[in-house]
């Protein structure tokens, strides 16, 4: 524990340190922590292996003390040299009865106490008796006297983050509104261009009509060609007819000669 304390000090003077974390440094008793740490407000000794609090220093400004997951069964009177204590975590220890907790009555500002996973919590009317013993207590094992759960620091962070996210969502909505306004403006411009499109359609119709007049000239030319073809056909028919008439005359003359010969 002494080496760990020196490491955590980081060359600072003992009376300048306000927070000290000695978690998991194995020791059955407190060694190396002295009365010099007069400015210390938060001390953590989680899972150290402590069996006793004998030798606990006088820490006049200590407000938060973490002693969970040790093997402490008694000796809470050694803590009374830190009268400003407000938060005490003794969960996961060997405290078996409420009598062992009597020294805590000296702490007039103790607001939070955690005794979870101690045999003392199995005593009849345990919570009611503890709240009666310690009038300043607000939360016992994470709940108040009305069994309302204490709000953790993590919940506060979530609420802050939640508000931020709502603001972000609101910002997104504003951007969407801006986009819709832009689209409305585009729609107005669309109405102006519609008249232009209408005028273009009229021009196209006029050009088609002019092309239709030109097409009429083509039809007249086609009609003239058809008339010429008809006249050619009539001339050909007359020529054929004139050829056939001499043939008939020759046949008539031949028949007349034959009759004379027969006579």
Curated annotation (Swiss-Prot):
InterPro entries: AN32 (IPR045081), Leu-rich_rpt (IPR001611), LRR_dom_sf (IPR032675). Its main location: nucleus. Residues 242-254 have a biased composition (Basic and acidic residues). GO terms for cellular component: cytoplasm; endoplasmic reticulum; nucleus; perinuclear region of cytoplasm. The lineage of its organism: Eukaryota, Metazoa, Ecdysozoa, Arthropoda, Hexapoda. GO terms for biological process: nucleocytoplasmic transport. Residues 144-189, 198-232 have a biased composition (Acidic residues). One of its GO terms (molecular function) is histone binding. It is found in: Nucleus; Cytoplasm. Signal peptide: none annotated. Phosphorylated on serine residues. It comes from the Eukaryota. This is Acidic leucine-rich nuclear phosphoprotein 32 family member A. Keywords: Cytoplasm, Leucine-rich repeat, Nucleus, Phosphoprotein, Repeat. LRR repeats lie at residues 16-37, 39-60, 61-83, 84-105. SUPFAM superfamilies: L domain-like. Belongs to the ANP32 family. Residues 118-156 form the LRRCT domain. Implicated in a number of cellular processes, including proliferation, differentiation, caspase-dependent and caspase-independent apoptosis, suppression of transformation (tumor suppressor), inhibition of protein phosphatase 2A, regulation of mRNA trafficking and stability, and inhibition of acetyltransferases as part of the INHAT (inhibitor of histone acetyltransferases) complex. The keyword Phosphoprotein applies. Residues 144-263 are annotated as: Disordered.
